[in-house]
Amino acid sequence: MISNYDITDSKSSSKVLRPPGGGSSDIFGSDMPQTPRNVKNRMVSNIFSVEKDNSVKNTVRQGAHRFYFIGDNPRRGQKPVDSHSRLFGEPMRPITPGKNHMKSSIPFGQNTETAAAAQKLLTNGSSTANTTNGHQYNGKSGSVSSASSSVSSSTENLKMNSGSRSVYIRNMSNNEKSKQTKTDTAGCPLTPVASAAAPPPADVLGIDLPCLDLEVGDVPKDNEIYTETGKHDVNIQTRRDSGSNVEQPHSLEKMRSTANLKEPLALCPDYVKEVHGPCNARNPITGLGLNGDGVGGLKPVKQKIREGNPVTGEGYRAGGTDYIKAAGSTNSGSVGNGDNGGNSVVNKNRVPPGGYSSGLW
């Protein structure tokens, strides 16, 4: 505790100051709270330990969770609170018979009469115990009983009395046959009776009605008169009647068809015939073209005679691009003999082969 002494009015006043940050601050070295920490060791086995009573936890619930209804389980760690049992006592639940899982699965029929006959046959005159609604309470008596157990015991009784299930099946089939015969004779006759067809509704079309077999009557007199076609003299008869036949020039096989109106009969008066001139087009890259013949050909190549000596320049002109006649002939560019090129005078005005750096002259 820190005291602050004030000298005003010669009186000492003691004031307790709170540490910065509130009373939870530990600046002034207050003692640690003595609340024990509950550290749970999760590696400890609790197989043989006694369960702790953790029921005093979160007993105050908010909203609709405060109320428990029948069959609701409380949350984990709380006491089971049943509002119905707390207010009205233990509820009266109906007692249901126990389920016998060892009962027989033999079907005994669907209707009650057949089931009663099967039950009477299986019991073989033995009386059932006086139970509520034909069943005994589970756990109320010493013997285990239910509807299925009584059927099982009756089956055992049938075996003990040297009974046979074939007798039961035969009796069941006889009962079914007699019942079916009675039903047929009473309600439905053995021979079917033709029922009158219901009239069709007014909005049904004629095409929707079922087809009826109509009997063909007598042939009219007009249909009996006919003319035989193709009946003529044997001498002039051919394999087929055609337009060349004299007696029957117009046959059914060679009838004149209708004119095709889409095809014009003659040229239109404003029709101008296009004149196609010769195509002189040629591919400038490959040299292929039509040349007007429509077949195609090669580009004519100008033949060049290169008979001059590229070293001495014999046979070439001064330009170096034109060709001359034969090697050894005189021209303005070079002079030489017809013998060889060794005695010829080289015209050094032209560019030597390989350029001036070749060192030829």
Curated annotation (Swiss-Prot):
Give the main localization category: nucleus
Q: Which GO terms describe its biological process?
A: positive regulation of microtubule polymerization
Where do transmembrane segments lie in this chain?
Answer: none
**What subcellular locations does the record give?**
Nucleus; Cytoplasm; Cytoplasm, Cytoskeleton; Cytoplasm, Cytoskeleton, Spindle
Q: Is Phosphoprotein one of the keywords UniProt gives this record?
A: yes
- Keyword Endoplasmic reticulum present in the record's keywords: the answer is no
**What are the Phosphothreonine sites (modified residues) in this protein?**
35, 96
As stated in the Swiss-Prot or TrEMBL entry, residues carrying the post-translational modification Phosphoserine are: 24, 105, 143, 154
Q: Which intervals carry biased composition (Low complexity)?
A: 125-134, 141-154
Q: Where is the composition biased (Basic and acidic residues)?
A: 73-87
Q: Name one Pfam family in it.
A: JUPITER
Q: Which UniProt keywords are present, listed alphabetically? A: Cytoplasm, Cytoskeleton, Microtubule, Nucleus, Phosphoprotein
Superkingdom of origin organism: Eukaryota
Could you tell me where the Polar residues compositional bias lies?
Answer: 1-15, 155-165
Q: Which GO terms describe its molecular function?
A: microtubule binding; structural constituent of cytoskeleton
PANTHER family membership: GEO05313P1 (PTHR34930), MICROTUBULE-ASSOCIATED PROTEIN JUPITER (PTHR34930:SF2)
Function of the molecule:
Binds to all microtubule populations.
Protein known as: Microtubule-associated protein Jupiter
